[in-house]
Regions:
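FAD-binding core of flavoproteins
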Residues: 1-56, 60
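Alpha-helical interface subdomain recognition
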Residues: 40-169
């Protein structure tokens, strides 16, 4: 969608110049504050992209890496990790797309909460599938995790999203 495409550039709209002011708790140069629904939604879309990519990386690695004479993806524990990653991605995708359609700040808060969980937990699970390889420069998994952590604290934290959602029950 348009929200995901705009966030994929990772540019100023999602937190470039205005992101510094918002991260410090104030408004950025364009008056964009930490709870700006557009910035929250674009960050959620960026997190959704990370979640999807780490799920793809985990599945691909699970199919390629062999242990005990068969791919590690043949082991049920690895299959469950990968399946859980895909479920979180699809749940977050629905929330991000819905928030993009409605433009509602409460929907954006819910989308950010779900996308943050999908990105951070997905990157952790991907790292687990990769094992020690995930922390080497040969794999980008550790970069996805670090960036997901940073974006989870940008524009709207989980606590702020939960407060926004609770206030509108």
């Amino acid at each position: 969608g348009a929200a995901a495409g705009g966030a994929a550039g990772g540019g100023a709209a999602a937190g470039g110049a205005a992101g510094g002011g918002a991260a410090a708790g104030g408004a950025g140069p364009d008056g964009v504050g930490p709870g700006c629904p557009v910035a929250v939604l674009l960050t959620a879309a960026e997190q959704l992209g990370t979640a999807g990519r780490t799920a793809e990386l985990a599945v691909r690695y699970a199919c390629e890496r062999e242990q005990f004479g068969r791919p590690i993806g043949a082991f049920q524990a690895v299959q469950h990790l990968c399946a859980d990653m895909r479920v979180r991605v699809e749940v977050a995708r629905g929330a991000v797309y819905a928030a993009a359609v409605t433009g509602d700040p409460v929907d954006a808060a819910g989308a950010k909460l779900l996308a943050d969980e999908a990105a951070v937990q997905g990157a952790r699970d991907c790292l687990q599938v990769h094992g020690g390889m995930g922390f080497t420069w040969d794999a980008d998994v550790h970069l996805h995790l670090k960036r997901a952590w940073v974006r989870a604290e940008r524009w709207m934290t989980a606590a702020a999203a939960e407060e926004t959602l609770a206030a509108h029950l």
